[in-house]
Amino acid sequence: MLQSIGGGPSGLYYASFYAGLRDMSVRLIDVQSELGGKMRIYPEKIIWDIGGIAPKPCHEILKDTIKQGLYFKPEVHLNERVVDIRKKAERHFEVETEAGEIYTSKAVIIAIGAGIINPKQLDVKGVERYQLTNLHYVVQSYRRFKDKDVLISGGGNTALDWAHDIAKIAKSVTVVYRKEDVSGHEAMKTLVTDLNVKLCPKTRIKYLVGNDDETHISEVVLEHVESGDRHTVKFDDVIISHGFDRCNTLLSETSSKLDMHDDCRVKGFGNTTTSIPGIYACGDIVYHDAKSHLIASAFSDGANAANLAKTYIQPDANAEGYVSSHHEVFKEANKTIVNKHLY
């Protein structure tokens, strides 16, 4: 059994898929309720820099990545936070979760990206009532804002990006932020202004006013941060873009102390090998001299880690697997695909 910690692109596509290709059984653990990692934060953004993949929204790439990552039916555990990794002996590791579950494996791949990432929550009384309706921390689809009056709280690049894209289809877009000026790119500020986005500096959300059954936000009380002046405005949807809380305590608190780079990334030794044999790191969490932080690089890292894990678990195994076009495991699936394209 190979243990993969993290369900983002690196952990999914190659630490899971490629390990299956190499005839390894895989257990994948992720702290989130859904697979995808950081890619779920920007589902509508267009991804251009994956070789051989035409530019398309991130959520479409993620859908294919998850499908491929689950091809060999890995054992998937969601909503489980790993708190410790222990090497008991060669090819004998224990991974413990916050709930006290202990999983054993012969090798471990760490693919946790920048750690646990969650959007910073709006600090307003009763906010939790609206999180399943019209209060959003991530924009899943621009279409839902068509002909709507939309409020965005935040002055960074993400807030301005959303304002720019949503303004093209919404009835109105208002952006509030605490500072005198937005912190996002000046060029983007000009673009949103040209789209008649209303920018409200030194303004914050003070209260959310619900509808009769308190399931949807109907109005927002806005407050000037200096004067304290307040006014109430009707909005159909409210989007919060206050940044993210990041947690990466696993690497600092684990029993298996790995060599680190700048105290925040695992030090890789020219590849995905770490300072502890049998533990590998891939994706954004690993650093080495040739590292580039791209989705495409995460895929490559995952394949490298899976190959190294294979030869660690089975020393007489080939260093690399067969290319997929000639792999026996896809023989029947290839027939279906060929017939689909020929007839």
Curated annotation (Swiss-Prot):
Catalytic activity, EC: 1.18.1.2
Reactions performed catalytically: 2 reduced [2Fe-2S]-[ferredoxin] + NADP(+) + H(+) = 2 oxidized [2Fe-2S]-[ferredoxin] + NADPH
Cofactor: FAD
Keyword Nucleotide-binding in annotation: no
GO terms of molecular function: ferredoxin-NADP+ reductase activity; flavin adenine dinucleotide binding; NADP binding
InterPro entries, alphabetized: FAD/NAD-bd_sf, FAD/NAD-binding_dom, Fd--NADP_Rdtase_type_2, Ferredoxin-NADP_redctase_2
Keywords: FAD, Flavoprotein, NADP, Oxidoreductase
Cofactor note: Binds 1 FAD per subunit.
Source domain of life: Bacteria
Binding site for FAD: S10, D30, K38, Y42, V82, I117, D284, S325
Subunit structure: Homodimer.
Family: Belongs to the ferredoxin--NADP reductase type 2 family.
Full protein name: Ferredoxin--NADP reductase
